[in-house]
Each structure stands twice: as structure tokens, then as C-alpha cells.
Amino acid sequence: MSQLTPREIVHELDKHIIGQDAAKRSVAIALRNRWRRQQVQDPLRQEITPKNILMIGPTGVGKTEIARRLAKLADAPFIKVEATKFTEVGYVGRDVDSIIRDLVEAAVKQSRERETQKMRARAEDHAEERILDVLLPVARETGLQMDSIEAESATRQKFRKKLREGELNDKEIEIELATPHTHMEIFAPPGMEELTTQIQGMFQNLGAERKRMRKLKIREAMKLLIDEEASKLVNDEELKLRAVQNVEQNGIVFLDEIDKITSRSETSGADVSRQGVQRDLLPLVEGTTISTKYGMIKTDHILFIASGAFHLAKPSDLIPELQGRFPIRVELTSLSAGDFVQILTNTDACLKRQYEALLETEGVRLEFTPDAVKRLAEIAFAVNEKTENIGARRLYTAMEKLLEDVSFDAEKHHGDAVVIDAAYVDKRLGDLAQSEDLARYVL
């Protein structure tokens, strides 16, 4: 993260998301500010809190994609949650504190994967030795003389060479492997998650690690042994400690569909999943301490990014206290036909390239002409205007319908080039786009 300036972060996001420059700039600055804060000396560092972001824009314009790509760039603990999944404390459903518990779980998993990767080379060596021990029992254990030991060592090196070159991959061996711990899930009422985690930990620690003999091919045994050896080399306590610290200093929470928990003035009735959830979110966003099975987590420096379409509600419908917790507001614009053309062709994993790669696996060479791409974008845009505007997601539907015949009869086109031009697009989608009723149900 320290290597990326805001301009470089925006450049990376441009590879995957078309337009929405204001939103990209805001998240880039917020991400860079995490690193800047780390360079400030205490006690001032503790006073610098992240400025949370509220992204406002219609569906399918890139709100979720911006958050998803940002998480990959940050390489920080990240979780995306739907605000509608939570209920006020005391009601049936998940309470908002579980957001932080899930974030810590994600951080522990991320730290474990990182540490395991560091230890992989050593784990591979240990796994290799264990397989060689099965193939060639150690000479000293069998009571052989020194010259026999030297001969055994030479044989071991020959087998090691064969093992590394993959010549023994399909050979079956019987090897002792640790049996994985069975995770027992205990469901508890809201507010008793701490007790639940303690009970789970107690049951997991009851049985010692058991081992059993398994008959496997060397290829499969090697994978399992590498994982087992790597887990032995990782210090679990240090790992959890670093994960907790990482969450507190670099954690990012993306709250999607926050507009769905607004309480509109014209509606009446229970607001279990609306104002109650907003009130519960307040301390979380402001800064509080949450109890998890890995210890107490302070949320003061966790960055919250909220997003919503706000079709039926306005940001001002959020309770005033929560509005104040999201000082940076960014409005995302609807996508034009020109944006659709760029989405189809200019991003790193554009739709056109994805379908070309998929059909290439069956020997079909798909070729899109520029006028076909333009016509497809125009049709998708027109359908969005006539019916519900679902943004770039309309392109997925249109592309599936366009290539339905080619995908179904791919074997007939094996070794051929299938050219998609404007006439082909009109033939497949023209009538559907012109009929509003058909477009509503098919596109």
C-alpha cells in the first residue's frame, strides 16, 4: 500500500472500472491516508480517524466493484456486507457487532495464508522427506552397516530426483496424516456470541490431534503434507495478534444497500431493520470496542465505506447522527452508451475478452467488429432507458442472448472463426430491443 499514491490507485482502478472519477479519487485519498497516518508519531496518530465515505448512485455503475478492487489493492482486512441482513439487538437476526467479528475472521485467514506462503519452501522440503521416508525406510532404523547406509543415501537421492521431476506422481503410498479438527457450530441468541466462542474452543481442545493412515497417490499426498507441515511452522498466537492489530489499524468495511435501512416519512410500521439498525451502527462507525474470540477490537480506525442507490430514499433520510459519520459523499453517474463501449473493450477483463477466452477453449475463434460492439452498447443503453436502468449489468444479459446459439453449438464451429458484426447483433437482439414487453422479460 505504501507504494501507491492516490494517482496510481486511480490508475489501477481505471483498468477495471470505466468513469466514476470522483468516487475513485475519494477512495484513493482515503486509502493513502491510512498509510499517511502510520507515518505520524503518537499521540497525534491516535487522534487521526478515517473519514468515512458514502457513495450514492444507481445500480450497476460500479459502486461494489470499486470497493472490491480497492480491497485487493490495499491488501488489508476487508469485508463487504449487506446492511439489510442486520436487525436491531434483541430481535431475531444478526446484530451489527458480527460485522467486526467477521472482519477479524477474514484478517486471521488472510494472515494465515500469508504466513503459510512464507513457510511454503520449508514445508515442501519437510513433506518431501516424509514421502521419501515412506518410499525408503531409513537405513539406521533397519540396522544396516555404514556402507549400506551410504548406498541407501545414494538411492534416496535418485528417488528425490524422480519425485521432483514428477515421475512418481501416480504411485500409491500409505502415509500417516493428521485428521482435521471438526468445527462444531453452536448458534446462540444475540448478545451471547462470546459465550458461544468459548464453548466452541472448549470442545475443540478436548481431543488431542489424531493421526490416521491413508492410502493416496504421491501427487495428492504431497499437497496434504505441505499444508500440514506449513501449519506446524506457523506460530498461531503471533499470527492472531498481528491479525487483530491489522484489523484495528487497516480494516475496511463496505456497507452495501445502506439506503434500504432508511426510514421514510411516508411509511409507517415496525423499523426493526431500519432505524434500529442505524442506531446500532452509530457506535461501530464512531468508534467502540467489540468482543471477539481473538480479543477486544477497537473500531476507532476502521474505515467504513457505505453505498446505496437511494431511488426511493434520500441520504437525508438517514438519522442525522449517522449522516455525520460519513463526511465524504460521492455521487456516481449513470452510464452512457459510450461508457458501455469502453466496458466491453477497454477494461483488463472486459466482457468481450471473457467470451472470446471461453469459446476458445472449444476451438472457436470469436471476432467482434467495432460496429458490433457499438451496436450492442446502443441496444443495452436503449433497453435501460425504456425499462429499469440496471447499468452495466444489462450488458451481461445482452451478451448471453447474443451468443446463445454459438455457445450451444460450439462443437459445430470447432476450428472456425465466428464473426460478430452489427447485422448479427440486430438479427439476434434488434426485435427484442424494439419491443418494450419482450425487452422487459428477455433483456
Swiss-Prot record:
Binding site for ATP: I18, G60, V61, G62, K63, T64, E65, D256, E321, R393
GO terms (BP aspect): protein unfolding; proteolysis involved in protein catabolic process
CDD domains tied to this protein: RecA-like_HslU
Highest taxon listed in the record's lineage: Bacteria
Disulfide cross-links: none
Gene3D superfamilies from the UniProt entry: 1.10.8.60, DNA helicase RuvA subunit, C-terminal domain, P-loop containing nucleotide triphosphate hydrolases
Location within or outside the cell: Cytoplasm
InterPro entries cross-referenced by the UniProt entry: AAA+_ATPase, ATP-dep_Clp_protease_ClpX, ATPase_AAA_core, Clp_ATPase_C, HslU, P-loop_NTPase
GO molecular function: ATP binding; ATP hydrolysis activity; peptidase activity; proteasome-activating activity
GO CC field: HslUV protease complex
Protein family per UniProt: Belongs to the ClpX chaperone family. HslU subfamily.
PANTHER family (UniProt xref): ATP-DEPENDENT CLP PROTEASE ATP-BINDING SUBUNIT CLPX-LIKE, MITOCHONDRIAL-RELATED, ATP-DEPENDENT PROTEASE ATPASE SUBUNIT HSLU
Subunit (UniProt): A double ring-shaped homohexamer of HslV is capped on each side by a ring-shaped HslU homohexamer. The assembly of the HslU/HslV complex is dependent on binding of ATP.
UniProt name for this protein: ATP-dependent protease ATPase subunit HslU
Organism per entry: Nitrosospira multiformis (strain ATCC 25196 / NCIMB 11849 / C 71)
Phylogenetic lineage: Bacteria, Pseudomonadati, Pseudomonadota, Betaproteobacteria, Nitrosomonadales
